[in-house]
């Protein structure tokens, strides 16, 4: 299917790594996390490849540009959250073009994310006729991850972050991988009115799934692998 844009989120500091280096610039087998994700995403041939930066923005932007001169750099402002990162990206990308197609969103700290997985996700999104699709997995220990909450028919109702989850939600082992596909126009509508009324005071991209459902779109994910 036509991939209008791919947005890689690389604005975070990565405080849990306790490093002066941005998390996405740490390396695996000689290549940065960011560059590995860029490789996997670029192989899908999106019309636009964007990288959102904030923490040590120039350093991360230079790493992205030196690796792929065609990348579009998006500066996230001081408003925190993945939802805000995508708001900034969409605002910049739609200044140039009227996006019409799919938009892939991926975190930059997933160096083992491969093109085949992304290709299958896009195919699932298209075949299912989804307005929004999220890649999930099941973990024995889901601590720290956003939990996938489904209805009785298996549709994704919402994603609840660890700090906002109640006891029953914390027991869910299916988690968000932070990889999504949205129809471009739906994404623009879904992120327009995100709120920060959560435990971390951030604009969550995960809330866009609930907004998508409110707009009549179906939010699904491929069947969990375990």
Set out the residue ranges of the language-model regions.
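N-terminal nucleotide-binding beta1-loop-alpha1 segment
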Residues: 1-19, 49
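A conserved hydrophobic helix/loop-capping motif in glycosyltransferases and polysaccharide synthases
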Residues: 7-11, 27, 37
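Short aromatic/basic micro-patch
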Residues: 27, 112, 181
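Short, high-confidence coil segments that cap the C-terminus of an alpha-helix
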Residues: 46, 98-100, 129-132, 217
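Conserved donor-nucleotide/metal-binding helix-loop-beta segment in metal-dependent transferases, i.e.
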Residues: 116-143
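Rossmann-like NAD(P)H-binding beta-loop-alpha module
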Residues: 137-168
């Amino acid at each position: 299917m036509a991939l209008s844009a791919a947005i890689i989120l690389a604005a975070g500091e990565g405080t849990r790594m306790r490093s002066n280096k941005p998390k996405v610039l740490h390396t695996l087998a000689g290549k940065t996390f960011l560059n590995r994700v860029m490789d996997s995403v670029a192989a899908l041939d999106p019309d636009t490849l964007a990288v959102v930066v904030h923490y040590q923005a120039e350093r991360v932007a230079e790493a992205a540009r030196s690796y792929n001169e065609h990348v579009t750099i998006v500066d996230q402002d001081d408003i925190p959250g993945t939802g805000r990162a995508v708001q900034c990206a969409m605002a910049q990308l739609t200044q140039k073009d009227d996006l019409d197609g799919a938009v892939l969103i991926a975190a930059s700290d997933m160096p083992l994310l491969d093109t085949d997985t992304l290709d299958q996700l896009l195919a699932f999104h298209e075949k299912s006729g989804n307005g929004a699709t999220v890649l999930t997995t099941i973990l024995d220990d889901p601590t720290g991850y956003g939990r996938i909450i489904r209805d009785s028919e298996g549709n994704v109702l919402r994603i609840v972050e660890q700090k906002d989850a109640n006891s029953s939600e914390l027991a869910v082992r299916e988690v968000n991988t932070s990889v999504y596909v949205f129809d471009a126009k739906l994404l623009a509508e879904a992120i327009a009115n995100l709120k920060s009324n959560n435990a971390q005071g951030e604009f969550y991209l995960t809330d866009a799934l609930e907004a998508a459902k409110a707009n009549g779109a179906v939010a699904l994910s491929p069947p969990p692998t375990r």
